[in-house]
From Swiss-Prot:
Chief location category: membrane
This protein's UniProt keywords: ATP-binding, Cell inner membrane, Cell membrane, Membrane, Nucleotide-binding, Phosphonate transport, Translocase, Transport
Free-text function comment from the UniProt entry: Part of the ABC transporter complex PhnCDE involved in phosphonates import. Responsible for energy coupling to the transport system.
Catalytic activity: phosphonate(out) + ATP + H2O = phosphonate(in) + ADP + phosphate + H(+)
EC number of the protein: 7.3.2.2
Membrane topology per record: Peripheral membrane protein
Oligomeric and partner information: The complex is composed of two ATP-binding proteins (PhnC), two transmembrane proteins (PhnE) and a solute-binding protein (PhnD).
Positions of ATP binding: 37-44
Record protein name field: Phosphonates import ATP-binding protein PhnC
Domain of life: Bacteria
Lineage: Bacteria, Pseudomonadati, Pseudomonadota, Gammaproteobacteria, Enterobacterales
Length: 262
């Protein structure tokens, strides 16, 4: 099976606090993987390293590959980082869309990496590109909102627009950081259904950070759980049982309660 993401000996320190400890991880083509863990476990930090949004410590032997290209090595970004980013879609908790633009215009932003520079200066997109953007919006159930401003949409609708933008980008990997954290249950279900549909029917690899274990169990075949910057569990979601859940979350809560009591 083709390895899409490879992480070796990744460490990260913030202000003398070590957020990640020599993490090793391989993610294969077509997987939908949940990164789980309590707040401060390192899951979002790990996700942001995968495409070089942040760099790791200058540890000997640390290395990250994405789509067969080096992203960073020993704390330094690769010179051709844009080539791997060009096929990587991002979905963030805070949506990361341009509120003053329409839904369609936001989706067309996904085509910038494959559009000649002179056309991007004038926001000129071809008829074929606009048609593809509308198809992407149809895919996520948002085509009827194409000409509305993004600022008029709900949080769940904005996340679906972000997914459509990744489709427009022709992403081979989608990295989603807490995409349902601020959504109501119905909106969260629709967003996760959309990600799973893209994963299963398009073969796009999806890595998603989640707080909600029930969503990870329902939508992802594989769970990678982090605890205090270490990989605590990496395996089939169906084997992530109550004992592992208790050790991952409740032991952390007890430490926090004891600290408050002191």
């Amino acid at each position: 099976m083709q390895t899409i993401i490879r992480v070796e000996k990744l460490a990260k320190t913030f202000n003398q606090h070590q957020a990640l400890h020599a993490v090793d991880l391989n993610i294969h083509h077509g997987e939908m993987v949940a990164l789980l863990g309590p707040s401060g476990s390192g899951k979002s930090t790990l996700l942001r390293h995968l495409s070089g949004l942040i760099t790791g410590d200058k540890s000997v032997g640390s290395h990250i590959e994405l789509l067969g290209r080096t992203v960073q090595r020993e704390g330094r970004l690769a010179r051709d980082i844009r080539k791997s980013r060009a096929h990587t879609g991002y979905i963030f908790q805070q949506f990361n869309l341009v509120n003053r633009l329409s839904v369609l215009e936001n989706v067309l932003i996904g085509a910038l990496g494959s559009t000649p520079f002179w056309r991007t200066c004038f926001s000129y997109f071809t008829r074929e590109q606009k048609q593809r953007a509308l198809q992407a919006l149809t895919r996520v159930g948002m085509v009827h909102f194409a000409h509305q401003r993004v600022s008029t949409l709900s949080g769940g609708q904005q996340q679906r627009v972000a997914i459509a933008r990744a489709l427009m980008q022709q992403a081979k990997v989608i990295l989603a950081d807490e995409p349902i954290a601020s959504l109501d249950p119905e909106s969260a279900r629709i967003v996760m259904d959309t990600l799973r549909d893209i994963n299963q029917n398009d073969g796009i690899t999806v890595v998603v950070t989640l707080h909600q274990v029930d969503y990870a169990l329902r939508y992802c075949e594989r769970i990678v759980a982090l605890r205090q910057g270490h990989v605590f569990y990496d395996g089939c979601s169906q084997q992530f049982d109550n004992e592992r859940f208790d050790h991952l979350y409740r032991s952390i809560n007890r430490v926090e309660e004891n600290a408050k009591a002191a």
